[in-house]
Design a protein with these regions (language model features):
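Hydrophobic structural elements of the Rossmann-like NAD(P)H-binding subdomain
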Residues: 68, 108-110, 181-184, 194, ...
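C-terminal helical subdomain
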Residues: 90, 150, 154-155, 159-162, ...
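Catalytic loop of short-chain dehydrogenase/reductase
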Residues: 72-73, 77, 100-177, 188-189
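Canonical Rossmann dinucleotide-binding motif of NAD(H)/NADP(H)-dependent dehydrogenases/reductases
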Residues: 1-30
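Rossmann-fold cofactor-recognition segment
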Residues: 34-49
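Short, flexible catalytic-loop segment of classical short-chain dehydrogenase/reductase
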Residues: 185-196, 205
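Short C-terminal tail/terminal secondary-structure segment
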Residues: 122, 240-265
C-alpha cells in the first residue's frame, strides 16, 4: 500500500535515510528542510512552519498519511528551542486536520537520548506552556550565564518534546482521531550533526563516557529510520505516547534496571 509521508529534516542524517527507504518501497515522500528539499522552509519561525504545512498540503493534494519530524539543531543557542520544539509541535498542529483524514494516520518524531540528561526545568515548562517568547528569553539567559549553562538547552528541548508527546497522545485530537504519536530517542548516530563530536579517538572516548552504548556502539541513520518507519506504519495500531530509546543500552547504563521505583519517587 502506497502512503504519503511528510518528513522534516530530509537534507541529511536520519531523515534522509528514512526518506530514501520509504521511496525505495514505493511511497511518496514530501521532504522539508532549509535547503535541498521539496519544500524549503525555516521551521524556526512561525511563518516558516505555517508556510511549510501549507505547501505540504498542496503537494500532497490534501492526502497525508504520516508525518515524521526529524528536523533539529544541536547548537547551544535559542534557535534550537524554536526548531526542536515549536518547529515540531506547531507544524504538527497545522497538519493535524489533513492528517486526520487518512485511514491510517501516524506521527513519529525524533527526540533524543538527551531527553534523559540534565535540563532546565524552567525552560521545559515554558515550552510545554507553548510560550515561545518566554522560552527564547530563558534560553538566552542560559547562554548569557555561561559556565556551561547553555548546554542545558538541547536536552531541555528534547525533554519537553517527549513530555508533549505523552501529554497530547491520549487527547481526542490524536487518540480520538486514531493517530498514534511517538518518538524515538537515539543514542549517538553517525550523522553530520555529530561528526565533529566523534572525529578523534579522544572525542569518542569522552562521548562514550557521557553516553555509553554497550550494544554495538554508534549506529548508522538507517537503524533509527527502521524504527521511525514502523512507528509511522499501519502496523502500529496501539503504541502511542512513547519515547523509544534506540541507544545501544545508554538508558539502562545510566538509569539502571529499576526505573519504576524512580517514577514513583
Amino acid at each position: 500500500m502506497t502512503r504519503t509521508y511528510v518528513i522534516t529534516g530530509t537534507a541529511s542524517g536520519i531523515a534522509a535515510a528514512t526518506s530514501r527507504i520509504l521511496k525505495e518501497a514505493g511511497n511518496k515522500v514530501i521532504g522539508i528542510d532549509v535547503k535541498n528539499a521539496d519544500i524549503e522552509a525555516d521551521l524556526s519561525t512561525k511563518n516558516g512552519r505555517q508556510e511549510a504545512a501549507k505547501k505540504a498540503i498542496e503537494l500532497s493534494h490534501g492526502s497525508i498519511d504520516a508525518v515524521i519530524a526529524c528536523a533539529g539543531l544541536a547548537h547551544p543557542d535559542p534557535q534550537t528551542v524554536s526548531v526542536n520544539y515549536f518547529g515540531v509541535t506547531e507544524f504538527l498542529s497545522a497538519l493535524l486536520p489533513t492528517l486526520s483524514q487518512s485511514p491510517s494516520p501516524r506521527v513519529a518524531i525524533t527526540s533524543s537520548m538527551a531527553s534523559l540528561m540534565p535540563n532546565s526545568p524552567e525552560l521545559v515548562a515554558a515550552m510545554l506552556a507553548d510560550d515561545e517568547e518566554k522560552a527564547l528569553a530563558i534560553a538566552q539567559g542560559l547562554v548569557s550565564a555561561g559556565a556551561g549553562a547553555e548546554q542545558l538547552i538541547y536536552g531541555s528541548t528534547k525533554r519537553a518534546l517527549s513530555r508533549w508527546i505523552r501529554r497530547e497522545s491520549i487527547k481526542p485530537a490524536w487518540a480520538g482521531a486514531g493517530i498514534p504519536i511517538n518518538a524515538v530517542g537515539p543514542g549517538i548516530v553517525k550523522t553530520p550533526m555529530v561528526a565533529g563530536m566523534i572525529a578523534t579517538p579522544e572525542a569518542v572516548r569522552d562521548i562514550l563516557q557521557m553516553v555509553p552504548m554497550p550494544l554495538n556502539g554508534f549506529m548508522e541513520p538507517e537503524a533509527v529510520a527502521s524504527l521511525l518507519i514502523w512507528l509511522s506504519s499501519p502496523d502500529n495500531t496501539h503504541t502511542t505516547g512513547q519515547t523509544i530509546y534506540i541507544d545501544g543500552g545508554s538508558d539502562v547504563a545510566l538509569r539502571g534496571e529499576n526505573i519504576w521505583d524512580l517514577a514513583l519517587a
